[in-house]
Amino acid sequence: MIYRTATFRDVESIHKIVNGYAEQGLMLARSRNSIYETLRDFVLAEDPGEVVGVGALHLVWAELAEIRAMAISPDYAGKGIGYKIVQQLMEDARKLGVKTLFTLTYQPGFFAKSGFYEVPKEQLSQKVWKIRRCVKLY
């Protein structure tokens, strides 16, 4: 398995994986345009020739970032790929000097394995609330 940053040739794969879960109501959909606009945020897992997992680190403002768009192809789920992507995104955040890292998720148990914990939305800035609609703040 190769873990790497996304390139323009990966947009269709990212779109397919993320929106496959969005169609099931498990995450928010992403347009191709939004993927292009945030392409540099994405880290991918690639089984030679095939993108099988994606995740993104989005900088919100000084020292605050969000992990978003975490999705693994169903055939590769449960193999630790998502965990490795999150670890890479967390390392990228550390290198950038990010002190607070959060995710808005429908899958809190997945992120708990990487040390995330649930906080009441009232503890987060209004700016964070406006980022997206989601069931859980993590």
Name each model-derived stretch.
Residues 10, 71, 75-76, 80, ...:
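Conserved functional loop/turn residues at catalytic and ligand-binding sites
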Residues 95, 99, 105-132, 138:
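Conserved active-site alpha-helix within GNAT-family acetyltransferase domains
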Residues 6, 102-103:
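Small/polar loops that bind or transfer phosphate-bearing groups
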Residues 10, 63, 106-107:
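A generic "binding-loop/recognition-motif" signal
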Residues 72, 78-93, 103:
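Conserved acetyl-CoA-binding loop-helix of GNAT-fold acetyltransferases
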Residues 29-42, 47-48, 53-64, 68-72:
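A conserved beta-strand-loop-helix scaffold within acyl/acetyltransferase catalytic domains
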Residues 1-29, 45-47:
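Short amphipathic alpha-helix that is part of the acyltransferase structural core
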